[in-house]
């Protein structure tokens, strides 16, 4: 079984507020488990969320100019 993190623990690992994590859950941008009234986030799902937002060195967004 994967380690389940509370919203507080997930926020601490992300370095963000609990409110941000709750918004991710509400917007269904991160997978979560509901245990009664409690929300838990699997550590592997949190890691996947972090990896999905990773920007590799040397990748620049394409800028459109003019028009």
Show the residue positions of the predicted features:
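Polyanion-binding surface elements
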Residues: 1-23, 52
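Secondary-structure transition/capping residues
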Residues: 21, 32, 57-61
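A short, Lys/Arg-enriched interface patch at domain edges and termini
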Residues: 44-67
């Amino acid at each position: 079984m994967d380690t389940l993190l509370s919203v507080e623990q997930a926020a601490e690992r992300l370095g963000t507020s609990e409110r941000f994590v709750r918004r991710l859950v509400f917007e269904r941008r991160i997978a979560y488990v509901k245990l009664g009234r409690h929300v838990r986030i699997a550590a592997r799902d949190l890691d996947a969320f972090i990896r999905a937002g990773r920007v590799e060195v040397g990748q620049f967004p394409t800028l459109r100019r003019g028009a």
